[in-house]
Structure formats: C-alpha cells, structure tokens
C-alpha cells in the first residue's frame, strides 16, 4: 500500500491533512527556506491536535547541510525534546564539506534519536554519491530517505529513485519535490511506495489593511500577505489515487 506523507508548515495545515486522509505529517516551519525546525508551541499543539504520526523536521537554518559544532548541539537538543514529547519520528540530515554523509555527526544524531524513525531529508539530493550514501544510511539505521532523485523534481529524478528503491537493503525511498495528483501514477509504476507532497496552494492573507513600502524581510519582492496552505481536497484526491483499488489498476 502506498503511503502519503504531507509536508505541513503549520498545525492548522497538519490538522487539515490528517482529516483529509494523509498517512503521516512532516511538520516544518520556514516554508520559504525549504523547512526549518518548528517551534515548541507548534510541536506541542501538533501532539495535542493531530492523531496521525507527525515527524518534525530538525533543521536549524536554511542553506547548506554542513553544520558547526554549535549547530549540531542545537539539532541534538531539539531531537531530545521532540523524542521526550512522544513524536514517533524525526526528519534530519547532515553533510560534510566534501558532500558526503557526515558519519560522525550522524552517529551522534542517531544515538539521540534512538527508538525513533529517522528520515534523512533532501540533504541526500545534495550529496556527491547517492549509492555510497544509501549504504552509509543503511548502516546507520535510517528508516527512510526523502529524495527527488538528485533532480529539481522527483519526476525528473525518477530513474535514480527507481534504482535506489531496488538497491535498498533497508531504508524506504520516499519520493518528494513536485509530487502531485497528476504524476502519482508514475511513482507507483516505478515501485515507489511512499510519497511526499505539500498538496497545497498559496492563499491570500486575511489582512484587509496592508502597509505599503514596509517589509519584514530583506527580500522585498516576497509577498508577505500570502502563505502556502494544505488543500484538503487535494490531499483527499491524492489519497484516493494511491488507494489499493487504484494501485491494482497500475499493476494489472
């Protein structure tokens, strides 16, 4: 059975995704930076309000995945807190200066995350050699790898995703980036059984008064009066599309 993980940037979105049939939530902050560690308040609210599994991302900043000693300490503290709050899994990833999995740092992270399902996020798509990385992450005990097949979209990276799925001795290969209702069948036909999607759209802020000429961000071209929200109808449609009955159509 294909599982659908929905990337959510708020607890409201996580509730919508769960009610619409998602199998799991990746909870993030910082949509415009590709996902950052959610706040304690968001984590606590998610634990109280979302019934399906929630895996928070732990990423202290945007940009690359090569972290300092202090950043690693922050990652470990966050994972410790997330584990103590009862979350079943966590999403994380660390590379070294040469583009390889940072094994010493990842070993420290895995020790702190003991007992949790660890997803190695799309830092995987920035690594030098995905086949070596797959073996290293297998040995580390990582549960799954979120990947676009080292391309801008998972559809473009489908060949590598298929090869990794066939080669994996352990971690589930979960396709993410540009996964949508219109291309789900391509991943199913490739034998990929976990899919990751934001399943949403940009929505306008409810603010009626909008101050002109003042921005809270140095990138003044960004529209601060819009936010990306999960669309429950899209989640429900995607879940129907990956249901067992539909899957039989792709293999028959």
Curated annotation (Swiss-Prot):
Q: Where in the cell is it found?
A: Cytoplasm
Q: Name one GO molecular function term.
A: copper ion binding
* Keyword set, alphabetical order: Cytoplasm
One Gene Ontology cellular component annotation?
A: cytoplasm
Instruction: Classify the source by domain of life.
Output: Bacteria
Quote the SUPFAM superfamilies the UniProt record gives.
CutC-like (SSF110395)
So what family is this one in?
Answer: Belongs to the CutC family.
The record, for HAMAP family, names: CutC
Q: List the NCBIfam families.
A: PRK11572.1 (NF008603)
What protein does this entry describe?
PF03932 family protein CutC
Species this protein is from = Pectobacterium carotovorum subsp. carotovorum (strain PC1)
């Amino acid at each position: 059975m294909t599982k659908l993980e929905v990337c959510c940037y708020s607890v409201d979105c996580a509730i919508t995704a769960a009610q619409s049939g998602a199998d799991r939530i990746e909870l993030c902050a910082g949509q415009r930076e590709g996902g950052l560690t959610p706040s304690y308040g968001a984590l606590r609210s998610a634990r109280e309000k979302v019934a399906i599994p929630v895996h928070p991302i732990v990423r202290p900043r945007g940009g690359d995945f090569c972290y300092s000693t202090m950043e690693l300490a922050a990652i470990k503290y966050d994972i410790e807190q997330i584990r103590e709050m009862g979350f079943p899994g966590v999403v994380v990833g660390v590379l070294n200066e040469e583009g390889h999995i940072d094994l010493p740092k990842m070993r420290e992270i895995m020790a702190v995350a003991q007992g949790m399902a660890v997803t190695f996020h799309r830092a995987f798509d920035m690594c030098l050699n995905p086949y070596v990385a797959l073996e290293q992450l297998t040995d580390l005990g990582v549960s799954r790898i979120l990947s676009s097949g080292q391309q801008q979209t998972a559809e473009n990276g489908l060949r590598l995703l298929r090869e990794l799925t066939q080669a994996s001795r352990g971690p589930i290969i979960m396709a993410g980036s540009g996964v949508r209702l219109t291309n789900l069948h391509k991943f199913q036909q490739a034998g990929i059984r976990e899919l990751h999607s934001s399943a949403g759209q940009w929505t306008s802020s409810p603010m009626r008064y909008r101050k002109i000429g003042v921005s809270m961000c140095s990138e003044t071209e960004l529209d601060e009066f819009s936010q990306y929200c999960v669309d429950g109808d899209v989640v429900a449609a995607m879940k129907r599309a990956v249901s067992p009955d539909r899957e039989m159509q792709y293999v028959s």
